């Protein structure tokens, strides 16, 4: 389909956002501040609506909906509101003597109209967190919530025009075909969160207009447990990260590498942690979510046959429930070890040396995050230094995403670009190079003719 056949609704919404940006209103610092304040008011006024929508879409527990979505967005909006003026200040840089008198600086300017394509697993957080970066940078935005989380998408479509500038921030809903039509439009930046297959389609569509992209994808994030680790605490934190949102977190630990001699201790501690979190029946726990839909449920259920189930394994298709599960003896070529799991199933793999564990991870695609547990600082330092990943967290999981000043992004197959906090402002800004020189003074050395004496003088500047 070429651009001439695109959905006219998409045309109108993108054109409205473009007109608002071209008018110049989004560059104004007061406008930016008001939009960020509007997001905070939206959350404060509709906290329960957000919780209900996330519950309908994902069976997300109330505590998760608040602490891992709504309140994180609120905190980031508040931090950006406090800081964007400082981030937006021009930065002076050294000007060579050959250009004296002159002044050089780097000026952040908004990229323009951004397309933000949200994800279904955290449909509130992963749609509005990048929007915060866009608003702080002074961009207009077209927001495309995930159609796979329809209750949250409907809520965003209802509330964003009420609390934000309804011309500069447009919400477009639709399925995959609608998203494809939207991608035919010209944007100044596209940010997509989701899987690698669609990420490639987004990048190909962006290439038609030479539009820069930020791709937040995923991958198989490893958790390496060193022999020096507190096994009980490592298991507890990994169990929390793997159970959060029923494992449907892009930075959740995908598999665990543990010393062969401590496998049983890890399994015992992991099972005990799950029992403390959710009791004897996770299906009855108010703090455990559900799988998004039947397609993902069936995909995850198939993984249960890729190894031997030693913890969990129960499923209920009628309620889209999969119990927190640990697999052992999963072959390296099994789908559960080749594909991002994105669910509460955890392969546990033994190793005989730390070198072997690191080599296992390095032989695979670069993950969105890497985790290491241990008291041996040198061993943990090696993982941070030698494993290329979007992020690293020592002795915990996932929490690096909650640090306001840390960027969130992948590397290699796990994505490109980053946002969150200052990184979000920078992502939606262009660093414009500026040189100002006086009208009257000029040495004339650069102008022809260039006899040898003049060249010798010029050489002294290089």
What are these regions (language model features)?
Residues 10, 29, 47, 231, ...:
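Residues at or immediately preceding the N-termini of alpha-helices
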Residues 164, 197-331, 394, 454-456, ...:
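ALDH superfamily catalytic-core signature
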